[in-house]
């Protein structure tokens, strides 16, 4: 077994607030890969990870998230991995922060951007992901499986469910996504990557703006 931890700490000088997160993972690679992770945090999180240049640093793209999560990842068959994740969080806007001395406040004013205002809410979400690496090569070193990878594209199937009412959760949605990606070398230049994703909300009865699926903004 291998135990690892990841910790992040932030401190806002103007608002005098500590924020951060911590998680601990237990990994076993005896014959097949298994990993259990538990984490907790209070952070300012990005809403849209594919913004245009104008909104990349805008405070309108952030929200406060107090969260706790757990995830379990394992190899079902050679090259076929599954991950089960549960996330519970309390989402609140940051419109009550003092941003008068923030470097990007003037940019937000010019672009007429403001921190998103919404009613705080609780969210319970489960996420299931299947990842297939076709014809994955490997070998055993004692009882440890050493993965060499595959020369074929990686296929991902993701299902997200916003669970209503559980622990006062206020969301209700279902999202399904299929993705294919690959990385390949280019002689004398390095590596290149491509990624194709196709997804849709098959249920959006109670879908908040933070849970929307965003596309890359135009620059």
For each feature predicted by the language model, list its residue ranges.
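Transmembrane beta-strands of outer-membrane beta-barrel proteins
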Residues: 3-7, 34-38, 82-84, 128, ...
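Residues that define the transmembrane beta-barrel architecture of outer-membrane proteins
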Residues: 16-20, 62-68, 120-126, 172-176
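Residues on the lipid-exposed face of transmembrane beta-strands in outer-membrane beta-barrel proteins
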Residues: 1, 9, 22-28, 40, ...
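Repeated loop/turn-to-beta-strand initiation elements of outer-membrane beta-barrel proteins
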Residues: 2-5, 30-36, 78-82, 92, ...
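Surface-exposed extracellular loop regions of Gram-negative outer-membrane beta-barrel proteins
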Residues: 1-10, 42-45, 136-182
